[in-house]
Amino acid sequence: LSALEKETGMVMSNSPTVKVGYEVVSELPKEAHEHPMLSLDKTKDVGALVSWLGGQKGVISWKMDGLTVVLTYENGEMIKAVTRGNGEIGEVITNNAKVFANVPHHIPYKGKLTIRGEAVIKYSDFNAINEKITDAESKYKNPRNLCSGSVRQLDNKITKERNVHFFAFNLVDGEDVDFHNSFKYQLDWLEQQGFTVVEHYLTDSSALPDKVREFSEKITENDFPSDGLVLMLDDLAYGRSLGTTAKFPRNAIAFKWQDEIRETTLS
């Protein structure tokens, strides 16, 4: 395994070759984001989604319901993890991110890489954790709240036990890589680096309603919480040229279901 890891340049957090150093900290330091995070504009109307995309190609993906985390890698190694916080300032949780179930500690790419993704706790893990709690009042209300607390632990041994998964959904900074001016290419490239990437598809306005329907049909069987979809322009240069409003980036939009389709049962 060590030889394979050396050959690929990829070492996952759950690899037996990784010696995890558990650490207890007194507080989580706060840090300003190099690239502030704006919220997305939202719609519940598929027609509005189609109009928004117009003649462009877009990438549609899950809007996962956990805690957004920004990971930074340098020289192939994770050097920092920060929560979204208020979009301007987040909490540094590097020790905790290193024990997420599926995050690579080392990647083949050696330049500076900054990515965003969602830390989530799967329904199956959420239910298993709740089953061990006998007092009904003490049970966790939903996977999102449990995930938020798990990611922001002062003791990363607890984070490890909660089996937090990370799904990459955006590449913020990757120097000296030709991404062919394509957001889809960026996501596929992240997958090649060893990241679990949010499920996504390239689409156009004519295929978009069917894609939305296909996603909606998967909700009840998904093992991870989501609260809608995200549609992002595939053309990176065009997306950047649109800039932002005071509140939202113009290169992406969120689609919310009319009602939450999957409910978590507390027993």
Question: Which positions does each model-derived feature cover?
Answer:
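RNA/tRNA-interacting regions in translation and RNA-turnover enzymes
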Residues: 1-267
